[in-house]
């Protein structure tokens, strides 16, 4: 019996051929986009969004490519990869920027990308930018939730060490993180796994050991039981973020949109920025920082970036308030 659940999800659902595989990560994004399309079309049909229902599919497709993928990937590269691995990691492998199927997407980058995309889309199609953004912000948490579930399945972006937490999870992927205490236990864990499953491949190379061990962990209960003592129990922070930044935020914004159909443009966008920043800052205290702290032991990179979202929240809420006051004055 394990003291704590040892993460053993396989990020690959099944392999097709020639190294091409269907991954949970890609499926999560697809589910988010399809779900967003369904919800946005419903809002459009109820006249609660500035676009016509027939334009919803094209808008979602363009937003996915130009906003989420490009913005999210560039955000990861500039906010996380370069500060962690240095500029040379990009200069020596520039094509790696486009390998989104390997993971590495920043939600702050995706949000910024969507802001830029919707601004130019609104100008081209002569619709309200804030009205366009309001609809997108209502459904965006669904995509965020799907992304966090994929992070959990991949065993990435795991939480901080949490001894005594009943629902803690042990992540074998921590063996490959040089900053994690588990990395110093890789050799011992590998030897224990070999004894538990002699049929497992052997290797003297550190990189090979990590890959072999994590693959065996997904297939062998004996290996899981053998490596469990060498892993630290951690917060499943991906699930916390999925619940708050995804499920709770989606419910709040959807209720506001339905209950207040004549809410001024910008209100929902402002609420999204403010609530997302609050939930993200809260959840970051349970998440293992991806890169160096902005302020040691006090402020993570995710929290630092989220602080700026309050500025956007204030701007959009201020715009909504002014719009509301003008409409009241003109109706008087």
Ranges and model annotations:
Residues 1-332:
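Hydrophobic, membrane-interfacing alpha helices
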């Amino acid at each position: 019996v394990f003291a704590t659940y040892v993460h053993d999800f396989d990020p690959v659902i099944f392999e097709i051929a020639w190294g091409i595989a269907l991954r949970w990560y890609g499926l999560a994004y697809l589910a988010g986009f399809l779900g967003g399309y369904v919800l946005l079309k419903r809002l459009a049909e109820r006249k609660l969004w500035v676009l016509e229902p027939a334009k919803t599919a094209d808008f979602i497709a363009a937003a996915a490519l130009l906003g989420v993928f490009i913005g999210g990937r560039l955000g990861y590269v500039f906010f996380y990869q370069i500060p962690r691995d240095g500029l040379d990691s990009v200069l020596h492998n520039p094509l790696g920027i486009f390998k989104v199927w390997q993971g590495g997407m920043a939600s702050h980058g995706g949000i910024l990308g969507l802001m830029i995309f919707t601004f130019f889309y609104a100008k081209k199609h002569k619709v309200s930018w804030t009205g366009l953004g309001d609809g997108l912000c209502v459904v965006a948490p669904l995509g965020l939730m799907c992304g966090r579930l994929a992070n959990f399945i991949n065993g990435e972006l795991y939480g901080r060490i949490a001894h005594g937490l009943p629902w803690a999870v042990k992540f074998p992927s921590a063996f490959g993180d040089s900053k994690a205490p588990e990395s110093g236990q890789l050799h011992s864990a590998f030897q224990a796994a070999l004894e538990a499953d002699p049929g497992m491949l052997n290797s003297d190379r550190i990189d090979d050991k990590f890959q072999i061990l994590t693959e065996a962990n997904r297939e062998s209960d004996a290996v899981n039981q053998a490596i469990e003592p060498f892993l630290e129990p951690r917060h499943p922070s991906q699930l916390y973020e999925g619940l708050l930044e995804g499920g709770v935020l989606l419910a709040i914004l959807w209720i506001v949109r339905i209950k207040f159909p004549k809410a001024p443009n910008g209100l929902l966008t402002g609420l999204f920025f403010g609530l997302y920043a609050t939930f993200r800052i809260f959840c970051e205290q349970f998440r293992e920082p991806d890169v160096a702290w902005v302020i040691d032991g006090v402020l993570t990179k995710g929290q630092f970036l989220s602080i700026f979202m309050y500025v956007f929240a204030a701007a959009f809420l201020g715009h909504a308030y002014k719009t509301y006051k003008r409409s009241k004055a003109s109706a008087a």
